């Protein structure tokens, strides 16, 4: 397996510490880092396989102590069939996590943390994207951005250069979609919430069921989040029987997943961009939208 290291640079620039992430058997993919200032820790998470181009077998966690500048612990949580069944309705549970990509980590006051990921895939008239296309190269890698893993700059696996289509929002004009293919379908589906205790042991798994699809652009699928003292709210757009609405699910601090009243969007010819949502208050957020060939912003309130 390739070498992975965590590098620490002091604020003065005088001290550099390299900590090797020792792992001789797991193939890490889509590595993400979360700094937990409240607990004085750095948390590294990654889905892993045990064979090259194999199925995702579990989630690897590496926790580093900021005060001592040393590794605190590592943990590899192998997914059982019971866990896999919670995130998919497929009969074949082997590949249940193969289309899930890490998005963010929410840390809790007791030292536990919740890993959030979303199922994403793209199809063209010739082929389907595979997470292994860029294994070790990084489907998310953007050499021109330091924080390339932060949304909305580059979450989805098909975003080879940091985002899917930043300058062209019209579905009929996207010559670079899926690397030159004339027609591409983008899917953003279930959101998986995996909770781990302070030692990195898997405690529970919850799923937000959704199915979103679009042609040639990915700006109008996905979800946004708001965090406050009550928990984390997930906001995504859904169209059912001609009615556009924002669906809101909230993960409370005690681990309960609740569904709030939907926000009905009565405006016609508006297309909403929930994954670019920006929180501006405890319960308020700015939500970008496209109206014909114009970009605008709406303020929403999640109660």
Name these PLM-found stretches.
Residues 1, 40-52, 103, 111-123, ...:
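Short beta-strand elements that form the blades of beta-propeller/WD-repeat-like
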Residues 2-119, 125-130:
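Long, internal scaffold/assembly segments composed of regular secondary structure
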Residues 2-3, 28-30, 188-190, 218-221, ...:
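Short, surface-exposed coil-to-beta transition loops
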Residues 19-32, 70-103, 204-224, 253-282:
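Conserved blade-ending motifs and adjacent loop-strand segments that build the rim/top face
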Residues 56, 96, 125-129, 144, ...:
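Intrinsic-disorder/low-complexity signal
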Residues 154-170, 174-177, 195-239, 244:
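C-terminal structural cap/anchor segments
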């Amino acid at each position: 397996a390739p070498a992975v290291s965590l590098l620490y640079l002091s604020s003065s620039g005088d001290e550099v510490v390299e900590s090797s992430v020792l792992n001789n058997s797991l193939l890490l993919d889509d590595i993400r880092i979360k700094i937990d200032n409240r607990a004085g820790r750095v948390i590294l998470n990654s889905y892993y396989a045990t064979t090259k181009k194999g199925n995702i077998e579990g989630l690897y966690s590496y926790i580093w102590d900021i005060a001592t500048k040393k590794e605190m612990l590592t943990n590899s949580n192998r997914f059982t069939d019971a866990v896999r069944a919670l995130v998919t309705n497929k009969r074949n549970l082997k590949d249940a996590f193969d289309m899930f990509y890490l998005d963010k980590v929410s840390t809790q006051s007791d030292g536990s943390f919740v890993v959030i990921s979303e199922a994403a895939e793209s199809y063209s008239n010739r082929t389907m994207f595979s997470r292994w296309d860029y294994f070790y190269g990084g489907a998310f890698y953007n050499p021109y951005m330091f924080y390339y893993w932060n949304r909305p700059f580059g979450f989805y696996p098909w975003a080879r250069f940091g985002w899917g289509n930043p300058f062209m929002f019209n579905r009929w004009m996207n010559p670079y979609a899926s690397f030159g293919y004339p027609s591409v379908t983008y899917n953003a589906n279930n959101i998986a919430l995996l909770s781990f205790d302070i030692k990195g042991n898997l405690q529970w798994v919850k799923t937000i069921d959704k199915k979103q699809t679009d042609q040639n652009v990915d700006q109008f699928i996905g979800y946004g989040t708001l965090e406050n003292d009550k928990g984390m709210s997930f906001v995504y757009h859904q169209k059912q029987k001609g009615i556009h609405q924002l669906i809101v699910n909230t993960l409370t601090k005690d681990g309960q997943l609740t569904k709030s009243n939907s926000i009905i969007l009565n405006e016609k010819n508006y297309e909403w961009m929930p994954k670019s949502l920006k929180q501006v208050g405890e319960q308020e957020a700015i939500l970008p939208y496209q109206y014909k060939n114009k970009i605008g912003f709406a303020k929403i309130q999640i109660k």
